[in-house]
Amino acid sequence: MSSTAENGDAVPGKQNEEKTYKKTASSAIKGAIQLGIGYTVGNLTSKPERDVLMQDFYVVESVFLPSEGSNLTPAHHYPDFRFKTYAPLAFRYFRELFGIKPDDYLYSICSEPLIELSNPGASGSLFFLTSDDEFIIKTVQHKEAEFLQKLLPGYYMNLNQNPRTLLPKFYGLYCMQSGGINIRIVVMNNVLPRAMRMHLTYDLKGSTYKRRASRKEREKPNPTFKDLDFLQDMHEGLYFDTETYNALMKTLQRDCRVLESFKIMDYSLLLGIHILDHSLKDKEEEPLQNAPDAKRPGMQKVLYSTAMESIQGPGKSADGIIAENPDTMGGIPAKSHKGEKLLLFMGIIDILQSYRLMKKLEHSWKALVYDGDTVSVHRPSFYADRFLKFMNSRVFKKIQALKASPSKKRCNSIAALKATSQEILSSISQEWKDEKQDLLTEGQSFSSLDEEALGSRHRPDLVPSTPSLFEAASLATTISSSSLYVGEHYPHDRTTLYSNSKGLPSSSTFTLEEGTIYLTAEPNALETQDDASVLDVYL
């Protein structure tokens, strides 16, 4: 058997190729995982709950499961194997922290066959998904499992301080031993829900050296692209409202500093993009083939498992996409440079890589041939800074609020002035109609009023309907905070136009010039309308 098959690739020469890992068929690995976890979690429920102690992080429990069964284990049709559980009490605490009950954990992993996923990475690991879409089970190398064991105390402390994180959430570490072969697996949170179709998937490191999806990967139905592909497809980045952007970058910065403190590097941001504008078309054309069965609820049950929960985001985009809506599956609302509405699903993956001697040597020889800053393998501090810079400047961007130009502001002010002027005219007209009624009730005749108001011009057929200039000016001050002036050419000495302290100019005019309102009077306008005052606004 070829070495590629041993690393997890398909065995050639078979119609329905079954993957193998370390010369063990994936079906045998899946069966052993379900049997082993079913036994160890069930056995753990009998132990009383207590606080996690330091020695609990280094406990390893082991059970032998023969194919014929035993007093403690059921019979099965797989080869005999031994199943080890690392730090069972510590991982039980982690599961409880995220609201995972033992029964739910067992039901998710053991009730239905595990779904095997393709692996776009170079590690050769196998990936399995639970039928309810909650958990990912991944095979890991010996060094990765060993590193996770050493990481557990610090990981425990970090989760206590901040359970909302984009870092992987580990729920269990196990080892299957059969025929002298050790297969180590880790149970983690699922970042990309199957119920939501991912139109684009990216694995981003912030590096450019060989960071383009291979031709083989591109031929897959759902390929995973890389950094250079993202820069080509989304050259202007992804846009968020201010609150969501700040929450996302704050979470990324905190998580990167945690990884840096553990001397972890070579991690990636797994980014799934669902285009809302395409979702209706997809539903009309074809049903979602890989959707979970009806037993699965619309949202994930595990606490802090969605992307929006992980960044502590507000759950609302600039144009009102609500992340709490079950249809969004907890995705983060965003927009593309084309204006497309998006839902983003993301998480930091592949954190079980410490900056050891082999990584230092790998970077050293690559830096001799290529630009050292573009190589993905780097010292942890530089890697974190480059990762954050790439996310902040090339991937995620903030929607800038549009500022109105001065001309638009002036137009808006003029429109408001016109509207307010109409209100003033209406109020003035109504006020004088009321006053006319009061005058009529007091017995004042139309002729005497005309005589007082118009002096020598006797117009008994007209009723004064225009307010005094000064009264109109006092009302006009509510239009704008601009200065209000009375035109100097106004004939103040013509007192014959006023009567009973409520003189009536024949007409009055507002003139607007650069934020200043001028009032002018035209006393020679003789023809006055009966039902409204002659008050014009010139702009």
Curated annotation (Swiss-Prot):
Its main location: cytoplasm. It is an enzyme of class 2 (transferase). CDD domains: PIPKc_PIP5K1B. One of its GO terms (cellular component) is plasma membrane. The modification Phosphoserine is found at residues 445, 447-448. GO terms for biological process: phosphatidylinositol biosynthetic process; phosphatidylinositol metabolic process; phosphatidylinositol phosphate biosynthetic process. It comes from the Eukaryota. GO terms for molecular function: 1-phosphatidylinositol-4-phosphate 5-kinase activity; ATP binding. It is found in: Cytoplasm, Cytosol; Cell membrane; Endomembrane system. Interacts with RAC1, AJUBA, PLD1, PLD2 and ARF1. This is Phosphatidylinositol 4-phosphate 5-kinase type-1 beta. It comes from Rattus norvegicus (Rat).
